[in-house]
């Protein structure tokens, strides 16, 4: 398995993501934001952080980068799997690769905590816990889109920490090859962190690509 981890100015979860990939025996390479081709990789990660300082809005500038343009070509070619975590989820929505948008948390405060989640996948053990850390994690979408969007939901908050519509914490696109989520599975892989629920997500990616 060969993973590419896209690094923008302001990305800060790239190392965590690389270590998590290597825990599963994957080759993991950093990809700078000016890269114009991603086709060498089985899975592409857009990790968390504050791409371009979150100027304009979270993900609002990253969507214009060469790497995101290359990501769109990667998606068209059906080459592999794409996962955007936290800021990566924001970028996927800004780029139009996932529906809806991520807005400022209700209460306007940055939230950093361990949160309960309910996962819509039989490979997961019902309820899990993962870290979150974001100021713009409130998922929103037009009301007339919500019926279709709810069919794409992969993970929901059990105790909504940010005011997300319908408790949405993460969702797929229609192909089930693009996944965006606000919680951080890469921060819950090693036993030293006291929580290994993030391993289920990496195991899911392996299963998707078999």
What are these language model-derived features?
Residues 49-50, 88, 135, 185:
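Active-site metal-binding loops of divalent metal-dependent hydrolases
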Residues 41, 73, 102-210:
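Amide-donor transfer/coupling interface in amidating biosynthetic enzymes
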């Amino acid at each position: 398995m060969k993973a590419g981890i896209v690094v923008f100015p302001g990305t800060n979860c790239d190392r965590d993501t690389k270590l998590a990939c290597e825990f599963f025996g994957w080759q993991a390479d950093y990809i700078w934001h000016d890269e114009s081709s991603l086709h060498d990789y089985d899975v592409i990660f857009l990790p968390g952080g504050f791409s371009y300082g979150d100027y304009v809005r979270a993900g609002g500038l990253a969507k214009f980068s060469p790497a995101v343009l290359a990501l769109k070509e990667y998606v068209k070619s059906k080459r592999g799997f794409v996962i955007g975590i936290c800021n990566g989820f924001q970028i996927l929505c800004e780029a139009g690769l996932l529906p809806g948008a991520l807005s400022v948390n209700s209460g306007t405060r940055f939230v950093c905590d361990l949160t309960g989640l309910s996962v819509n996948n039989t490979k997961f053990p019902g309820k899990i816990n993962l870290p979150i850390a974001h100021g713009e994690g409130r998922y929103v979408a037009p009301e007339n889109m919500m019926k279709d969007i709810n069919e794409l939901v992969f993970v929901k908050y059990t105790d909504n920490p940010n005011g997300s519509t319908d408790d949405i914490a993460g969702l797929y696109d229609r192909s089930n090859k693009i996944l965006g989520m606000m919680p951080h599975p890469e921060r819950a892989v090693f036993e030293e962190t006291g929580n290994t629920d993030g391993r289920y997500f990496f195991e899911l990616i392996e299963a998707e690509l078999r």
